[in-house]
Amino acid sequence: MGKQTKKKKSTGAAKEIFAKPPGRLGKWNVIAFVVLVIGEFIYYYAATPAINIQSTSFWVWMVISVALVGFCTLDFTVESNDTRSVATKATKPAAWIVVIMIAVGLIMVAASSKLFCASKYASLINIEDGDFQTDIPESRQINDIALMDTSTARIIGERAVGSLSDVVSQYEVSGNYSTIDYNGAPMKVAALNYAGFIKYMNNRKNGIPGYVLVDPVKNEAHYIQTEKPIVYSPSAYFNNNLYRHVQMAYPTYIFEGFYLELNDDGNPYYICPVLESHAGLFGAKDVKGVVICDPCTGDTEYHEVSDVPHWVDRVYDGDLVCQKYDWYGELSGGYWNSVFGNKGCKRTTDDYGYKVMDGDVWVYTGVTSVNGDESNIGFAMMNLRTGESKYYKVAGAEEYSAMASAEGQVQHLGYKASFPSLINISGIPTYIMVLKDNGGLVKMYALCLLYTSPSPRDTR
């Protein structure tokens, strides 16, 4: 009887522990909130999202965070080996905030769409009619043309570093080459990356010693050692990570990418374009300025698009300028015309190339009808520093058709064509491309007028 009495008292004591005034926060809730706050700080440090209402990732983060706040306000009560959650006074407001945020977010997504803002999407780019013979300098010698594509640059760049045992054992050449104008000459530049987390930990105090510079005209690559080591890199971790460093310096900015460039003295800088929306809250994002980061010192400086230094080449990304042209070509006649009528609708082809002219880097791409045939109705060129855009009404074969035609001429050799460059031969728009073997070595080149078949030539 005595033992049974003690058991009943023990059970009663357990009920008293969990029995607290309903609707109030208890010790479990306080612990949950502390864990949540710590988790939020860890997430922000790891992901470093932009704290900006024009960022969809920021909205997702906020909705999840408020939902977790609501979860932390629940009161978990134990009754007869059953665990039940009971809402407190703070749970319902948190739930309503989540519902309202989701509803507002969906409304803003709809209000930012092409359906309601077609004219704003179409007006992001100003297209001028260009004169091909005047705008594009005439090419007189093949050996003065930059014909190297990125895959070939990677091969040559890795060879330049491969002979340096102390470098190649700790670092690897980035596959992201930037096409730049370096003191009047077209160049491709790539950073060195840490070859994994362990290599970063072993070398973080020494930093990255240099970068790779590739000459696409001479087919040469050089490893350039910097006076000061590169401390901030996309391949670094913790506080040395370039993205984290720049985003935390400008927490409200929405960054579009990070591109390595060189100033006139050969010093490396990362160009970080900043985006803002022009249609509703989320739509029609375009570059409003750039943050220039010195990766050796960590110093950063913001410039509006109109105030960017002349040595900077990549304010706009090639994908972005082509996207803006597509919006212009498809939505100038209104949204419903782009869906059903397609009257006057046009868009860029699937890829683009780079052309260095007058100290700037331009993107060129074919323009075709939305009906999707294998011919171009013209081509467009966009300046990646100023955003200036020109359209040339020159009909002919689209780039991939020219590549396929060139490969057909040497199909017995099995060579593959690179994406063509656009040149001016006696006032005639002409594609020129290299033909490579299975090992990626350049064997021949092919010339193709926009409206004729290609003529392959041996590189010798």
Question: Positions of the model-derived regions?
Answer:
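Internal/C-terminal transmembrane anchor helices
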Residues: K89-K114
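Surface-exposed loop/turn elements that mediate protein-protein interactions on large endomembrane-trafficking
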Residues: M381-Y391
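Membrane-anchoring hydrophobic segments
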Residues: M1-A47
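Long alpha-helical, hydrophobic tracts
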Residues: K228-Y364, V370-N376
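Exposed beta-strand-loop-beta-strand "reactive/processing" segments of non-cytosolic proteins
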Residues: V168-R204, G257-V291, T349-M381, S418-Y445
